[in-house]
């Protein structure tokens, strides 16, 4: 099957999904909400509302990976679909209330969401099953330089579930006989240096084989290069992260507005959480020194989730998640719901943090990272953030090297659109337990080393 046919079939399946998810909203609108608006809508107005719903659902669905049949589990598809539908319903409910000039009954909207959950479940199961029957996993080879991390790539990261991994080749084996790749439809290249990788790339492209490159830090830095012409030659200019003044101004304005609105809306939750933490013994808040842009130190403010003497020996440790006996009973709850992060809105308002940016690390842990990976200091080119690319698309226990690459990908391409996407995608991970997993038990220091007693 050609790529064109593949893409057309996928678009048809996505259109079916849009229609299925829109039907409950359409019934809700036609039977109830259309009669609540101040001015009666004609048929054009009704179709406009349905079109607005479909467009918003499609855009939010892309943010929440609601259509990614090839790489998402059925449960993840349903979760993304329902989240996108609920967000769209919420936006249009506000629009309807504004058009009605009053607060409308929310029960019909809840009924629509229930219908959308059923539709999303039905579509996800059918679409996922159809996809893998129609497009079985492609025969795939993995070419690697160092075997360390290969098992994680194939098994833990789910490569073997989506691709039919026929062989794993050391880069030397591959270069000795490139024809080994001839029967493959896809090749993953992991940790291979540029010279050897380019030889494999040229061969695969010539043979019409899809190539997926897991980049090194240098590749990520190069991705943000500026193409130009000098001396009658094509040149790529690579330099320090330099976002435009306009971008920085709008980003700071967005930080102020979002943090102020968040503090006002979440103030009741803020108060309840503070009382709950205080009742667990000890202060409600704790401050900790963190690093932001250019290595500047600041005190981050969080709700206390651990015992007061959690680091009485003075050793900086990462959390090991639910198994960490330093976390209090209330701490387990607020960490699972991310409520411990709420006071950071004050850091954002003050200007220490941004809404979106690399995770602010402790100086001691950052020093450990830099000792093993000098490139880690490149993260400090941008202001640290409450949420970020690595937090959204990785896990708490994703390797430091992988997190570094994710952060550098964000830094290399500053964009308000990307910031908005990350902010919206953050909602998705709030309710995903794996995103709050700690490091492995015993691996309590920054690089996964066990602390000496």
For the regions a language model picked out, list residue spans one by one.
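C-terminal terminal-structure detector
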Residues: 375-453
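Signature of alpha-helical transmembrane segments in polytopic membrane proteins
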Residues: 1-132
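A short, structured surface patch at a secondary-structure boundary
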Residues: 320-383, 422-430
């Amino acid at each position: 099957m050609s790529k064109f046919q593949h893409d057309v079939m996928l678009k048809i399946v996505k259109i079916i999904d849009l229609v299925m998810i829109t039907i409950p909203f359409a019934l809700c609108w036609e039977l109830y909400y259309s009669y609540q608006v101040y001015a009666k809508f004609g048929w054009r107005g009704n179709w406009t509302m349905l079109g607005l719903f479909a467009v918003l659902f499609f855009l939010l669905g892309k943010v929440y990976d609601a259509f990614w049949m090839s790489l998402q589990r059925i449960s993840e598809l349903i979760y993304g679909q329902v989240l996108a539908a609920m967000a769209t319903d919420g936006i249009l409910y506000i629009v309807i209330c504004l058009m009605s000039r009053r607060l409308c009954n929310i029960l019909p909207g809840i009924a629509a969401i229930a219908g959308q959950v059923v539709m999303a479940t039905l579509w996800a199961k059918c679409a996922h099953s159809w996809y893998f029957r129609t497009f079985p996993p492609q025969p795939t080879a993995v070419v690697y330089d160092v075997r360390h991390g290969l098992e994680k790539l194939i098994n833990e990261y789910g490569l073997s579930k989506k691709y039919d991994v026929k062989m794993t080749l050391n880069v030397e084996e591959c270069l000795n006989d490139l024809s080994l790749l001839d029967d493959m439809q896809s090749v993953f290249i992991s940790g291979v240096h540029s010279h050897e990788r380019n030889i494999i790339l040229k061969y695969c492209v010539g043979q019409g084989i899809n190539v997926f490159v897991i980049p090194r830090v240098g590749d990520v830095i190069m991705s943000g290069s500026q193409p130009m012409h000098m001396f009658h030659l094509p040149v790529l200019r690579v330099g320090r992260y330099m976002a435009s003044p306009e971008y920085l101004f709008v980003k700071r304005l967005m930080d102020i507005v979002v943090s102020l609105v968040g503090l006002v809306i979440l103030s009741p939750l803020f108060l309840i959480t503070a009382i709950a933490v205080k009742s667990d013994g000890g202060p409600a808040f704790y401050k900790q020194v963190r690093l932001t842009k250019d290595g500047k130190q600041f005190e981050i403010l969080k709700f206390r989730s651990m015992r007061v003497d959690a680091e009485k020996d003075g050793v900086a440790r990462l959390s090991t998640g639910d198994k960490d006996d330093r976390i209090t009973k209330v701490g387990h709850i607020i960490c699972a719901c991310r409520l411990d992060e709420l006071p950071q809105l004050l850091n954002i308002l003050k200007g220490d943090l941004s809404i979106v940016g690399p995770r602010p690390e402790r100086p001691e842990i950052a020093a450990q990272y830099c000792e093993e990976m000098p490139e880690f200091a490149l993260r400090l080119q941008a202001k640290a953030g409450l949420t970020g690319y690595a937090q959204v698309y990785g896990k708490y226990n994703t390797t430091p090297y992988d997190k570094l690459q994710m952060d550098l990908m964000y830094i290399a391409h500053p964009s308000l659109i990307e910031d908005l996407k990350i902010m919206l995608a953050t909602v998705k991970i709030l309710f995903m337990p794996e995103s709050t997993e700690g490091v492995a038990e015993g691996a309590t220091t920054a690089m996964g080393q066990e602390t000496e007693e």
